[in-house]
Amino acid sequence: MQDQFEIPVENTSLWSSEFPNLYQLELVLYDAQNEILETIHEQIGFRKFSLEYGIMKLNGKRIVFHGINRHEWDPKNGRCLSLEQMEQDIHILKSLNINAVRTSHYPNHSYWYKLCDQYGIYVIDEMNLETHGANEIIPQNKPEWTDCLLDRARSMYERDKNHPCILMWSLGNEAGSGSNFMILHDYFKEQDPSRLVHYEGITQDRTFENASDIESRMYASPENVKAYLEAHPIKPFMLCEYMHAMGNSLGLSLIHISEPT
């Protein structure tokens, strides 16, 4: 059974990266005898995210992501991060004026989203999907993968949907293209039209262009970015990956961010 109701709230302080104002919501369920059955506490924020003429806006003002891809990884403990390590990560990001994180390439620990709510970090929440090396085969248009993909999408959405920090749902990473991504896109938009859907794989097959509300690319040159924006102003452009710290790389970052477009 599902039920919906609305409670008007006046004179709220809006949530943003600069001013991450939060409120405590308490939901109490009573039985017919007025006995408490369940109490839920939720940390919530009020904000309006919109896309206007290809420009992302939060609370009516243009926003630009200065972001990173973040893996849940520690050199000593592997993928088992402590809460203290997550807090350390968030403090490092804020000290570097980073305002956005893509949860590459899977949903993160639930505590991470609470920190992003509290400290004002925009989140691209990414599904646990990557078929690197086999993305020309899996999942593509194959119906045998659809239920599995939708199960992962639902799990992420239902767990994370109330976080004000999440501005986009991401369909995964380097998993090719195909009709399954249109199905995933439509699922998220049906559940949550207030957020955008992100997927870089549309650049591999323009047949499914509408699977992403964002023109997302990897390692494009600044010249290519400018050329796209001049020719295709409808979608916002995002470099979901543009620097990689393998070996002796990770230089020349300034040319990607010094000239806003």
What do the predicted segments below correspond to?
Residues 1-123, 151-152, 162-168, 184, ...:
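Secreted/periplasmic carbohydrate-active enzymes, especially glycoside hydrolases
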Residues 90-93, 100-258:
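Substrate-binding/catalytic cleft of secreted carbohydrate-active enzymes
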